[in-house]
Amino acid sequence: MARLALPGVGAYTARAVMAFAFELDAAVVDTNIARVYARHEGRRLTPREVQQLADTQVPSGDSWAWNQCLMDLGAVLCRPQSPGCAACPLAGTCAWRGAGADPAVGSAGVSRAQAPFEGSDRQARGRLLREL
């Protein structure tokens, strides 16, 4: 990933640019996607594990839609509190549904509190993406 050579651009930003700006096959793992994968697998996942799993599941030539759908699934149905399991398209294969303790808690960094936005790396990445 040559985009990683840019100062301040890490794996997530590089993958997001590849998938959303250039529509290249790249798995993007944000908080919502990490939660979906951890719950679906029914276990805690390290950041490396969730990225490797996501990399194996991106459909060739359709990563833009795939990543967007997973982000939306995590934001709208597979929410941190009160998930909408009854309406989830993955409910039939979800290892977590009704199994008890939520494996997403503490998994792949999905539970970390975020620092203030103003002056953050997130703000800088947003400015960089707008310029691309």
Predicted regions and their residues:
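Catalytic cores of DNA base-excision repair glycosylases
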Residues: M1-Q123, E131
